[in-house]
Amino acid sequence: MKVLVVGSGGREHAIVTSVAKSPRVDKIYCAPGNAGIAALAECVPIGAMEFDKLVAFAKEQAIDFTIVGMDDPLVGGIVDVFEAEGLKVFGPRKNAAILEGSKAFSKDLMKKYHIPTAAYENFTSAEEALAYLETAKMPIVLKADGLALGKGVLICNTLEEAKAGVKEIMEDKKFGTAGNTMVVEEFMTGREVSVLSFVDGKTIKIMSSAQDHKRAKDGDQGLNTGGMGNFSPSPFYTKEVDDFCQKYIYQATVDAMAAEGRPFTGVIFFGLMLTEDGPKVLEYNARFGDPEAQVVLPRMKNDIIDVMEACVDGRLDTIDLQFKDNAAVCVVLASDGYPVSYEKGFKISGLEKFDGKDDYFCFHAGTKFDDNGDIVTNGGRVLGITATGADLKEARKKAYEAAEWVDFANKYMRHDIGKAIDEAK
């Protein structure tokens, strides 16, 4: 069969890597792809938001199955456009992708269906938000309602910071129309854990847990980013936590969406906070995380096409989802200055060292070919260096070793990815 993957990041490289392992797949295309994906798939110069061009390409090439990795096209309704043309596509429809596309929607859904989450209020007026904050308990969390590249969340320790945050989100429109509505949420403390799942509209199957590192600098300092590294599984995601989430969160979310007439098909990413009062939902994403996909997919035993097709066909209950009893750690190599300003176009050396190594993966995010055919940096997050091992400590050691194999002029990484592994009992 012929498969088209839509997107261009490390997550899409991880998806393409899994698809390439399927004996059912003869040909992979990726739009627009990147320099790493090009080793496994034919990259097509069509942007992820160019729905008409993507549909025309899928028809022209007789694509059997399309996988959408990114949030923007999903929230924008790419699945509806493909389905209307009779094309098979993996991902939620527009009316279900709102689970990620609007934080206000997802908070209201959780409240209505009693899914554990932080107390909150939604605001469409900056004045009302400011009045509410005058009497609110600090610290407090402000969230832009819409998509903001994972950066639309502000944690405010004082009233002054909160007022500045309202100005930034609602008045200065730092995140554009994503800030037309704003969620104000109680600040929760605990450990953050990500859990990825496959969903077919009614059945949900949990993949594995992972733990992200959002801040740009060591010691969780600096600005929020799309993610600087990751490990899977999380040692803090215990059987007790899983039992609670299975009972009160996972199926409850799928059932809530179905009850609202918005059946969800695709991947639901649960961002959880493990609080003293039990697990609570921080956020939902309507797709694989990045770099969560890079640590979870290499551990999956199943043929990814079998699982994704079962989701689309509504027969996920027939799939026995299995993961290796191992661990993975991903360290992101970024351009120095990310997530604010950074130079790009630097030549990357050492990529060939990953060839033929089973336990090591170099997932490309911000890379491209220059005019000479050399692979150069082309973004803030450049590569996701991932290693698997028998346990988290071994995987971490291997990932940091492999991070030294590659070099480019403004290479930057965190040196404490997975430090929480040492804190686990």
What are these regions (language model features)?
Residues C156-A293:
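Internal nucleotide-binding/catalytic subdomain
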Residues M1-K94:
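ATP-binding N-terminal substructure of ATP-dependent carboxylate-amine bond-forming enzymes
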Residues K53, A129, E161-A164, P339-Y342, ...:
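Short, conserved charged micro-motifs
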Residues C245-I268, N285-K357, D370:
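Active-site "cap" helix and flanking loop/linker of ATP-utilizing ligase/carboxylase catalytic domains
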Residues T367-N372, V376-K425:
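Generic C-terminus detector
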Residues A20-K21, G36-A38, E60, F90, ...:
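Solvent-exposed alpha-helices and their adjacent loops that cap or buttress functional pockets
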Residues L4-V5, E100-M182, Q211, P235, ...:
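Active-site nucleotide/adenylate-binding loops and adjacent lid/helix of ATP-dependent enzymes
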